[in-house]
């Protein structure tokens, strides 16, 4: 059904792009395995992915995925068993991921930069039987070995699946860049040997349904012990279809999309919005194994005709500040999506100046597969909001009593839609606490729905600072600090104060490397913020703690301050 409603409770429907339905088919029987099968049938000779300048077609991707399935079946795995992937964006990742899903197994994505403790928790909590790990991180597996319950590790190399050039890539990684620390692991198999082992068997098709589990996507690691969000095939397919409906209104049926996948595929945003979305379109994704290697990153995208890119605020800021990035040909760039953390107006302005395209902010969480909101793709300027709820998605703003507040009023953002997770893995109490009595997922984010239907985020509830009874949202203060011409990055936290309960404290990274004048910065803030929001102290740092995706870790700054 196309939107033509003047729905006062859902004002966003009146602002949908032409042709975008207010509902998708929520009863589709399609699975992620079907996405790959369709791509193999319809786009067999099209490039599916590119790594280190070498491309893999959809036909080749399907063939390798079936071999991965066969290998796991020969190891004795059954439908529903969990398989962990611990690697960055290398060619083997999509092949292994699709292979796991084709077999009816469940993908457990693990951040390759995790410590042995974090790896052990996620492996044992999920019950993963097999781990595919890039050899660069095998030493972490060795450290965790005594505590791990997994049966086997398959060792992947960065050059796997890219032919002759792969040998060169592997040699450079191991012997020139020395990226591989020594390790010794029992019960391991090189990925190339695993594929040879698989070829000795026969692929057995598995019946997969929309209510089967696809991913255990762990979340909450920046605020506490990570818990696994259960994402079913229907959750992910719904989100991919929601994204496709939004794109179709803007780009029609264009069939030559090239997505630059710079965010790691173990992160839900890149997984859905880059890898799976692009497979549905029959496009090609350019895999960036290390987006922090900016010279190599920019060199790669200079050689591509990118039409789409997904970034986080810190990555957009770093790229737009580089002279070599300013030399990239952006003439084919249709849009750039920003998500994963708050996008700052100063960064969006700089991005537009460099690329000629606005940053289009979206919003979501691991628990929502992840896209819940996105701005229209035809905007000319950054809106400052996170967009409109996508098709079949309802957002309700609730007060601390669980009551829905009026349009324009602030409260907790609660989401209902087919992309919302089934619950947390083996944590019924956490699951129950995370949903309202009428079935909305409680995000823990504070925001509002404006009169025009645009959703605006204030901050995380747990990050909100209470100064003399007044709410201060770190995002707002960080945005003001980031507008200063010499501030590259900013982070704001609350610290205990005997007079006001809490006080605002800021940390900044300067562009020129010099220490920022504390009073000068407070004057800057006073011009743009009411008094209780102005930081009591502003400290210059060489860098700020971040997750591998680039999200600033306020918790680490708070912990450091509390330790004294």
Which residues does each predicted region cover?
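Gly/Ser/Thr-rich phosphate-binding loop
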Residues: 303-310, 320-381, 394
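Conserved AMP-binding/adenylate-forming core of the ANL superfamily
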Residues: 28, 45-90, 94-98, 115-120
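ANL superfamily adenylate-forming
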Residues: 142-210
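Conserved AMP-binding/adenylation subdomain of ANL enzymes
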Residues: 237-258, 268-308, 322
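AMP-dependent adenylate-forming
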Residues: 10-17, 34-57
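Conserved adenylate-forming
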Residues: 72-77, 198-211, 216-261, 283
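AMP-binding/adenylate-forming catalytic core of the ANL superfamily
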Residues: 114, 131-135, 309, 401, ...
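A short helix-loop-beta submotif of the ANL/AMP-binding
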Residues: 46, 82, 88-116, 124-130, ...
């Amino acid at each position: 059904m196309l939107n033509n409603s003047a729905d006062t409770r859902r004002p966003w429907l009146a602002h949908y792009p032409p042709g975008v339905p207010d509902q998708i088919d929520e009863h589709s029987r399609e699975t992620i395995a079907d996405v790959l099968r369709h791509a193999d049938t319809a786009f067999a000779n099209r490039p599916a992915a590119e790594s280190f300048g070498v491309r893999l077609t959809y036909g080749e991707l399907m063939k390798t995925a079936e071999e991965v399935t066969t290998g796991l079946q020969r190891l004795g795995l059954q439908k529903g068993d969990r398989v962990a992937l611990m690697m960055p964006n290398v060619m083997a990742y999509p092949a292994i991921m699709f292979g796991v899903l084709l077999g009816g197994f469940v993908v457990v994505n693990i951040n390759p930069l995790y410590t042995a403790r974090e790896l052990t928790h996620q492996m044992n909590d999920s019950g993963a039987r097999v781990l595919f790990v890039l050899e660069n991180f095998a030493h972490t597996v060795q450290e965790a070995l005594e505590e791990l319950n997994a049966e086997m590790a398959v060792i992947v190399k960065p050059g796997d699946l890219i032919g002759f050039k792969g040998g060169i890539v592997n040699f450079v990684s191991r012997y020139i860049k020395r990226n591989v620390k020594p390790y010794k692991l029992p019960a391991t198999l090189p990925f190339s040997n695993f594929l040879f082992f698989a070829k000795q068997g026969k692929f057995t098709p598995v019946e997969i349904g929309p209510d089967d589990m696809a991913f255990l996507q762990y979340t909450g690691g920046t605020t506490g012990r990570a818990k696994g969000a259960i994402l079913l095939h229907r959750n992910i397919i719904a989100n991919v279809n929601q994204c496709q409906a939004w794109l179709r209104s803007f780009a029609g049926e264009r069939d030559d999309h090239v997505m630059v996948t710079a965010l790691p595929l173990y992160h839900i945003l890149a997984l859905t919005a880059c890898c799976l979305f692009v497979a549905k379109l029959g496009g090609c994704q350019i895999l960036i194994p290390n987006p922090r290697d900016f010279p190599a990153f920019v060199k790669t995208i200079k050689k591509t005709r990118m039409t789409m890119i997904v970034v986080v605020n810190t990555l957009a800021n770093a790229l737009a500040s580089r002279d070599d990035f300013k030399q990239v040909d952006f003439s084919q760039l249709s849009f750039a999506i920003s998500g994963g953390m708050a996008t700052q107006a100063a960064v969006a302005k700089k991005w537009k100046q460099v690329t000629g395209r606005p940053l289009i902010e979206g919003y979501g969480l691991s628990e929502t597969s992840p896209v819940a909101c996105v701005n229209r793709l035809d905007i000319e300027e950054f809106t400052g909001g996170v967009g409109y709820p996508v098709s079949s998605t309802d957002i309700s703003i609730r007060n601390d009593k669980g009551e829905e507040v009026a349009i324009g009023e602030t409260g907790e953002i609660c989401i209902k839609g087919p992309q919302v997770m089934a619950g947390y893995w083996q944590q019924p109490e956490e699951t129950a606490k995370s949903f309202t009595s009428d079935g909305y997922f409680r995000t823990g984010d504070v925001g509002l729905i404006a009169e025009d239907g645009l959703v605006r985020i204030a901050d995380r509830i747990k990050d909100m600072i209470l100064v003399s009874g007044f709410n201060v949202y770190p995002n707002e203060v960080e945005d003001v600090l980031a507008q200063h011409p010499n501030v590259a990055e900013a982070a704001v936290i609350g610290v205990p104060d005997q007079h006001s309960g809490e006080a605002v404290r800021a940390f900044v990274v300067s562009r020129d490397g010099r220490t920022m004048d504390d009073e000068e910065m407070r004057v800057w803030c006073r011009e743009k913020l009411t008094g209780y929001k102005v930081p009591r102290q502003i400290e210059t740092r060489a860098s700020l703690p971040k997750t591998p995706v680039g999200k600033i870790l306020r918790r680490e700054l708070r912990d450091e301050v509390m330790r004294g």
